[in-house]
């Protein structure tokens, strides 16, 4: 369909029976209206031509050959005279055969049928709106029981039963023969509602605005009651409150989309265009047909049998009619979702028939295989790797991908800056990779975001915007904190990069899709940018340190060298550093390793000074100074028992991790102060 802005779009939802007829019906010049499929036939076994009013009828779905009717006559396509657009003999319209890809038909059901998606889906929309248990609704739909139709204000037989229970017990001998009399059909139609027709009547009587008001009042009453102390009652109250919220949201959605609730019960069943459910003839008289055709045949046969029984309702037993209605309901359920009734339907070779749901859903379904995942212009694809130097809103694009994506922008700037005279010379400069090309490319990329997407895109965080930067190699660099939103890791995953062209698309990417603006999960509100997988392993390696404590003995605990003595000479002693910069400098000079224990001078902490912890060892020097050694820190004092400095026992990995946290907190504090 095409919206008001002339954008092609696909919309899935409920439609009215009038809309289904409008999709299928065609008015012939003789006044006949075609569009209803009434026969389960496909092709004639002798002529191999589509059967009239069948699943491949040319009058309903259009000609098989462009401009040629079923009789073999041809007319000029697009003739002005209305009578010349249709064959006078067979009634086939002279149009292009491609109409068979989108021209629909319909089956007029002899009884209403519930749509299995809305009855048995989770949550069940029908049960939600009617505020009734799903099991009772299923029993009503499949004829397990009936309910009294409140059509009049006078007491009916079923409602009088509660008033005269004792009298009914004495009249059982006269009630049973009544159900087999011809007058029972009239009584049943007037007093009893069963099947999907009963559901349709209840849905048609609903006032959605009253449902919203009543649900809101009940929710407020439950909210005011608070907690009773009974765990079971409180749990029931919470479940009821959640149900009321969902019911209000569903009713509001029906109102906003102008959809009537009774449309969830089908009176007309749409028939797909024949090109979407083809029959293919192969060599050796082999015929390959779509499973949808067999399921449509099953529906039409059962529906025709029910229509025949209803025409002769005076002779047909009521139980037989109800049983046939149940068969029609099950046939439509199998067509829409073959697994909805337990075991799916199988053919003679024990192969499961593929229903409409099976054709649509999954990786091999119509949407993901045929409509999604196609190649588009201004896009690329590559493996993702960690970019440790990137900010959260940045991604690294390889030179090869970047120059392809931004080629037109680079050519425009080359011509604008008079670096070249025409497009051909500009392309040659790009091909020869001249230095000016990379300068202009960086200028173009500086203000132009890109979109990164990882399939499958299951929620909105599966595609996010980033500020691109040029990197060497052929892989896309990504900040590890954004991996959870994409459900990605760095074990060979690939991601697609797209370039938004219009100003509207770029503005949307900057305002709504940038990664640093999507820090919380849109579903539950929990933080989505949290360390996972590779980042957790890196933090573990960074902070694991040397497990040998300060009180370790002089023998190495390594399994491979259980008796090797540790050499405690001057070189192997734990070094002392006055600042973290000195420790980092020693690491760059390869004087210490990442997990080597060291002593780092720390600010005087009153919690340490006032601690009552007993030192492990006290070392005195010749000048009167002393060192009090504890498990995780060291105090240096002078001869006057004054504390001169404190050293903590740590590793370079812990120092690096602490510095990163400190810088992040300072940056957040500055940003928060600017907003205030």
Swiss-Prot record:
Zn(2+) binds at residues 69, 71, 87, 90. SUPFAM superfamilies: beta and beta-prime subunits of DNA dependent RNA-polymerase. It holds the Pfam family RNA_pol_Rpb1_2. Mg(2+) binds at residues 489, 491, 493. It is an enzyme of class 2 (transferase). It catalyses: RNA(n) + a ribonucleoside 5'-triphosphate = RNA(n+1) + diphosphate. GO terms for cellular component: chloroplast; DNA-directed RNA polymerase complex; mitochondrion. The keyword Zinc-finger does not apply. DNA-dependent RNA polymerase catalyzes the transcription of DNA into RNA using the four ribonucleoside triphosphates as substrates. In plastids the minimal PEP RNA polymerase catalytic core is composed of four subunits: alpha, beta, beta', and beta''. When a (nuclear-encoded) sigma factor is associated with the core the holoenzyme is formed, which can initiate transcription. This is DNA-directed RNA polymerase subunit beta'. It comes from Lolium perenne.
């Amino acid at each position: 369909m095409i919206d008001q802005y002339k954008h092609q779009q696909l919309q899935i939802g409920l439609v009215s029976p009038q809309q289904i007829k409008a999709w299928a019906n065609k008015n012939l010049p003789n006044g006949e209206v075609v569009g209803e499929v009434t026969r389960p036939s496909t092709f004639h076994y002798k002529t191999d031509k589509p059967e009239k009013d069948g699943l491949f009828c040319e009058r309903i779905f259009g000609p098989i050959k462009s401009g040629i009717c079923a009789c073999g006559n041809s007319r000029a396509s697009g003739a002005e005279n209305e009578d010349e657009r249709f064959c006078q003999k067979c009634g086939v319209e002279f149009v292009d055969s491609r109409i068979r890809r989108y021209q629909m038909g319909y089956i007029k059901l002899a009884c209403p049928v519930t749509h299995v998606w809305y009855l048995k889906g989770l949550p069940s929309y029908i049960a939600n709106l009617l505020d009734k248990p799903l099991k009772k609704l299923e029993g009503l739909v499949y004829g397990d029981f009936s309910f009294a139709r409140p059509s009049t204000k006078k007491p009916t037989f079923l409602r009088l039963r509660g008033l005269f229970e004792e009298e009914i017990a004495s009249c059982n001998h006269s009630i049973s023969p009544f159900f087999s009399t011809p007058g029972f059909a009239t009584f049943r139609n007037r007093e009893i509602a069963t099947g999907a027709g009963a559901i349709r009547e209840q849905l048609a009587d609903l006032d959605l605005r009253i449902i919203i008001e009543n649900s809101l009042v009940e929710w407020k009453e439950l909210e005011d009651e608070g907690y009773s102390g009974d765990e079971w009652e409180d749990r029931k109250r919470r479940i009821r409150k959640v149900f009321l919220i969902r019911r209000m949201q569903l009713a509001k959605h029906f109102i906003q989309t102008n959809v009537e609730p009774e449309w969830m019960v089908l009176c007309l069943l749409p028939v797909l265009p024949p090109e979407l459910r083809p029959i293919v003839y192969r060599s050796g008289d082999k015929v390959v047909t779509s499973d949808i055709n067999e399921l449509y045949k099953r529906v039409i046969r059962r529906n025709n049998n029910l229509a025949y029984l209803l025409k002769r309702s005076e002779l047909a037993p009521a139980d037989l009619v109800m049983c046939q209605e149940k068969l029609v309901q099950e046939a439509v359920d199998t067509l829409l979702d073959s697994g909805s009734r337990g075991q799916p339907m199988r053919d003679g070779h024990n192969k499961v028939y593929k229903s409409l749901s099976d054709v649509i859903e999954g990786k091999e379904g119509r949407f993901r295989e045929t409509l999604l995942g196609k190649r588009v212009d201004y896009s690329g694809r590559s493996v993702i790797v960690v970019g440790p130097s990137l900010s959260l809103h940045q991604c690294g694009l390889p030179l090869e991908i970047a120059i392809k994506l931004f080629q037109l922008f680079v050519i425009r700037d080359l011509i604008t800056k008079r670096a070249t005279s025409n497009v051909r010379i500009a392309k040659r400069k790009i091909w020869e990779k001249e230095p000016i090309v990379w300068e202009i490319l960086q200028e173009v990329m500086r203000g132009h975001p890109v979109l990164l997407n990882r399939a499958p895109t299951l929620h909105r965080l599966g595609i996010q915007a980033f500020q691109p930067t040029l990197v060497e190699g052929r892989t896309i660099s990504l900040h590890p904190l954004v991996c959870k939103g994409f459900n990605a890791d760095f074990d060979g995953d690939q991601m697609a990069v797209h370039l938004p062209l219009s100003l509207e698309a770029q503005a949307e990417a900057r305002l709504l899709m940038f990664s640093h603006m999507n820090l919380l999960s849109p579903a539950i509100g929990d933080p989505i940018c949290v360390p996972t997988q590779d980042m957790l392993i890196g933090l573990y390696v960074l902070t694991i340190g040397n497990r040998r404590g300060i009180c370790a003995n002089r023998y190495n605990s390594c399994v491979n060298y259980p008796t090797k003595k540790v050499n405690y000479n001057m070189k192997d002693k734990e070094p002392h550093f006055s600042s973290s910069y000195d420790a980092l400098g020693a690491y760059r000079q390869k004087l210490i390793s990442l997990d080597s224990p060291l002593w780092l001078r720390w600010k005087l902490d009153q919690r340490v000074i006032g601690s009552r912890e007993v030192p492990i060892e006290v070392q005195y020097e010749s000048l009167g100074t002393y060192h009090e050694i504890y498990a995780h820190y060291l105090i240096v004092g002078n001869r006057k028992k004054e504390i001169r400095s404190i050293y903590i026992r740590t590793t370079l990995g812990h120092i690096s991790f602490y510095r990163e946290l400190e810088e992040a907190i300072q940056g957040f504090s500055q940003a928060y102060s600017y907003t205030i």
